Amino acid sequence: MGQTTIKSTALDFTAIKNNLKVFLSQQDEFTDYNFEASGLSSVLDVLAYNTHYNGLIANFALNESYLGTAQLRSSLVSLAEGIGYIPDSMNASQGIINLSLNLESLANRPTVVTLASGVKFDTVVDGTSYVFQTQEEISARDNGSGSYSFTTADNVADIKIFEGTSTTKTFNITAQTENAAYIIPDEKIDIDTAIVRSFETPSSTAFTTFTDLRKATSLTSTSTVYILKETPKGEYEITFGNKTVLGRSPVAGNKVTVEYLSVSGETANGAKVFTPQNTVTVNSQNFTLQVSTVSNSFGGSDKETIESIRTCLLYTSPSPRDQCL
């Protein structure tokens, strides 16, 4: 009795072709055929290549479905989503500085000078220019002689500045769809710097601030939280709750803004000198901020590597707020 099956799981092209020859030669319809002839040999080549490629695709697909064998970042990102683990994004490099202002020559000096978030500083690392900026409001009080030393809202004199470009992505919600995802086409987001706000209408000034799910301490049907995570394509998407799971979401007619830093990662580490981009205007006069570096820039990093994701997934419990320890 002739062979009725072909072993197509082998990935070796020659072995597949030989299996085809054996199979066909045992069929009554092909008993007198010369399978080494150029015509039949070419047909067998096509069949063998097709089987070979299908076998490779099947093996690749299976390998990419498992944590231990996946090789593509997109596969590991998808596996991470299944247990609620959010791979780390790029991280902004940060420096620490002291800021002061000398208004000794100014008449009618104000008691307090306040600077909004986003004060920018230029620096150079290994010949490449970077921009760092504050991420919170800072203020300084006259010491009685016209010298102002800036502190944070917590009265801390060491002020953190972060590398990156301030970016805002706006979404006008036209329809409320369950589990809707909004794409942010930027692979350089530092998700820790994101600020998410929802406005009642596109022209509203009042807003509700949503909290990163990783930082939420409790969840109810009315919680305002968001999830900002990497997609298999490498960009990012933001999702909200559905009034039952993970709280509520923006509704049709709302406007959602996502402010974040688009960063350079590790290459911005090591900056030593920070020069203010702009002067400070007080009583219609311009003054230059005085900067003292407390710490060279540090902490910038690229996206979490696939091997780190793999290791973290092995030791992370299935909770959206968990991160690798």
Please give the residue ranges for each predicted region.
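Signature of Asx- and small-polar-rich beta-strand/turn repeats characteristic
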Residues: M1-S317, R321, L325
